[in-house]
Design a protein with these regions (language model features):
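N-terminal leader/targeting and pre-domain segments
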Residues: 1-17, 107-119
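Local sequence-structure signature of Cys/Sec-based thiol-disulfide redox active-site neighborhoods
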Residues: 7-45
């Protein structure tokens, strides 16, 4: 269907995509805000898709990933996870590894600061 095709094209054409409620500058839920904040703090170039703008995308992304909640982050076309998973990966250093492995530029010093503040 069209939503699935749009989602596939979006995650293929963009290195880091966050399907979220709201936008990067105006998140509409705390979970979306948390991941957007992490991506922005790490100076990552990423695309925000506001699922509130399109019910087909909102439901379509849940079907696409077989994951029931939003936000959802994709890196190089692969579903990484939602808020809890991304937060855990950030704190464990796994997110750094994921970005490094996929040649995605990010601010390593900022990532280290987040971990220091949460240790």
């Amino acid at each position: 269907d069209t939503a699935q095709a749009t989602i596939k094209e979006t995650i293929t054409d963009n290195d880091v995509v966050l399907f979220m409620k709201g936008t990067s500058s105006m998140p509409q839920c705390g979970f979306s805000s948390r991941i957007a904040g992490v991506l922005n703090f790490l100076n990552i170039s990423w695309l925000d898709i506001n699922v509130l703008d399109d019910e087909n995308i909102r439901q379509g992304i849940k079907d696409f990933s077989d994951w029931p909640t939003i936000p959802q982050m994709y890196v190089k076309g692969e579903f990484v996870g939602g808020c809890d998973i991304i937060t855990d990966m950030m704190l464990s250093g796994e997110l750094d590894t994921l970005f490094e492995t996929n040649d995605i530029k990010f601010d390593k010093a900022a990532a280290d600061k987040v971990r220091e503040a949460n240790s």
